[in-house]
Amino acid sequence: MTKLTVKALSEEIGTPVDRLLQQFSDAGINKKDGDSVSEGEKQSLLVHLKKEHGSADDSASPTRLTLQRKTRSTLSVAGSGGKSKDVQVEVRKKRTYVKASALEEEKKAEQLKAEAEEQAKRDAEEAAVRELEQKAQREAEEQAKREAEAEAKAKREAEEKAKRAEADKAKKEMTKKNEQAKKEADELKARQELEATRKAEAEAAKLVEEARKLAEENEARWKEEEQKKSAAEKDADYHVTTSSHAREAEDAADRKEEQQPRRRKKKAKPAEAAAPRGGRNQRGGRNKKAQVNKPTSMQHGFDKSATVAKQDVAIGETIVVSELASKMSVKATEVIKVMMKMGAMATINQVIDQETAQLVAEEMGHKVILRKENELEEAVLSDRDNSAEAEGRAPVVTIMGHVDHGKTSTLDYIRRAHVADAEAGGITQHIGAYHVETDNGMITFLDTPGHAAFTAMRARGAQATDIVVLVVAADDGVMPQTIEAIQHAKAAGVPLIVAVNKIDKEGANPDNVKNELAQYDVIPEEWGGENIFVHISAKQGTNIDGLLEAILLQSEVLELTAVREGMASGVVVESRLDKGRGPVATVLVQSGTLNKGDIVLCGQEYGRVRAMRDENGKDIESAGPSIPVEILGLSGVPASGDEATVVRDERKAREVANYRQGKFRDVKLARQQKAKLENMFANMEAGEVAELNVVLKADVQGSVEAIADSLLKLSTDEVKVNIVGSGVGGITETDATLAAASNAIILGFNVRADATARRTVENENLDLRYYSIIYQLIDEVKAAMGGMLAPEFKQEIIGLAQVRDVFKSPKLGAIAGCMVTEGTIKRSNPIRVLRDNVVIYEGELESLRRFKDDVAEVKNGYECGIGVKNYNDVRVGDQIEVFEIVEIKRTLD
């Protein structure tokens, strides 16, 4: 038998010689590759390997060999930005080979394994039995605890039920007593009213009898006096011929009647009122005339009501005081009096807001109907037929960047590369938007130099832009206008694609651009961000197609859709006044289809589309979503960013445009409102020192210096008095002009304004005040400055409740059963939850109940249920603290 060497053994078992020698060395056998290996040495090596690979005994057992392998490869994966990424993949494999040498050993191993499994099974069963016993013990303890809680709860409910029964009984008794007292009071009142009525009727009858007796007593004397009159005076007027005694008697009767109560049950009969006193026509005529022209108080049938009839007053967003008075059928002075009582000063021609007018009208007892002035506008804009389904549309892209970073070059190259030569050759782009066709779809570009249009659209809320492409030069980096573009894009909430331009120039460093943009939260996708970076060269045309693909990929993520059929709506990109064609507006259609002849409402302008052209100057008949067009036929030049909407009726469009013009004029006038002492705080911008500009004029120089020194001493860190002009003498037009230019108030001390100055003050709506006492002037300015100070707020604890128990509610979660220990718990106030005198939660109450009834507050010494909003970790022993925020009015020290 030939001897087996180490080298031959390594070839036989497929193991490198070095590894086999190492294994021999680990087993305590020193060998070289040429040495022979005996059976004993092989057995020793096998035992060592078995120990190393987990064998438990040294006897002959299956040989176990474990192989571990590593495989590395590179996998190309497509990224979200359209670029592929290389990912390193490492595969690890582990295999174990076992060789059976003896059947007995295998059986023995199986027997040992079965015994081990049986032992493990017995141990698991014993553990399960122990766990069941522990679980049963815990359940018994919990059951006992629940029974105790249920018993305590039943006891509390019984006590509460008894208390409620007693309270209900007392309430019923009190109600019965109140009803009995009310019944007795009603009976007494009815008896008193009946007695008063009888008494009034008796007095009225007595007065009638006295008047009749007086007339009978004086009738003979009247006849004698009348016979003494001349015949020429027979036809004289009643007021001339009636004797003074008769007039005195009638006046006395009238005065006596007026002193008595006016209430009576009888009226004079019509026949008695028309019949003459005697048989003669002369005296009968006089008597009849006297009765008609001078009726007594006994003949009056009704008194004119002093109350004003209630009116339904329709009030718009603003209304003039005189118009409000006319709608309420009262004089304007009455309205001004009511406003003065309410603390508001107004003139007859002053415009007041809707809220003030509503308070005045309701104070005077009228019903108010609030009207929106833009009802017609809303009706016109809602009368549209856009019931079609939305379809995919092309993205609208705005390219921004710093000056000389290649923005215009990028636009020009895209236009030359993707527009046919017949259309693009020699034609200069003459509108601010155009669209290009690519293999994957259409893209619309907006050219907004200086970001003017983009800012205007963002300010008006018109999301005309879907994607912003930021062009940054690789050799120049981030510049101020680049930062401005980033801010515009983030404010508008649109995604940002960065085009790193000029990569073909020497000194280009795209990585530096990434690092600088990362400081402004523009992170590349390679770094785990959301912004796509594309390296391009606008001059050479390098990777321009990649930029377009990135734009289309981003638009697919946005899933842009629009209604293609129906009445169109869009936004005005730019507008101008052409010499030969009139107002021209570039409109980007956002939804629907714009057709030639449609009636368009653009902001404050309107008109019928007389002509429509694309970006190449060609006449077209219609345009769909994401298509920019030039339209002619508007009444004026609209503003950039105005919404363009197709409407049905030209007359209504004109009315809406006129309303918008008037509203814009009112807003403009309101913005020109000069600073006044009453609204100075509204004119103060947050974070800045408020300034009160003053133009001061006095009668003597000493007064000017004293007042100026006192006013300047009033200045603080938050409010500053700035005297822009001062002098001696009357207030002139120059002073009024200075105050208008500097938004100042005019203070006159013992001086007055001349006619031209008063006219300027009225035209510019300035605040002019006269004073004769210096302390009144200083006190009013000081009060105005105090109103400009920001208010302070202080928290005051108004109640404290102790948590006695916690209940679970399916609707409100954890409900804390509490006892109010201090103050009052109010539902509307904020709260804090304290545990061990440490605040663990601050919020508000969601529920406050007492005896299952929602209450507004619970006072000291009463129990209540409290549910804390958005907080369920209330425990027994916690404290719930209720506080209120009190505003402290600040004044100048």
From Swiss-Prot:
One of its GO terms (cellular component) is cytosol. Residues 426-430 are annotated as: G2. Residues 51-203, 216-300 are annotated as: Disordered. Residues 447-450 are annotated as: G3. Belongs to the TRAFAC class translation factor GTPase superfamily. Classic translation factor GTPase family. IF-2 subfamily. This is Translation initiation factor IF-2. Residues 102-203, 216-238, 245-261 have a biased composition (Basic and acidic residues). GO terms for molecular function: GTP binding; GTPase activity; guanosine tetraphosphate binding; translation initiation factor activity.
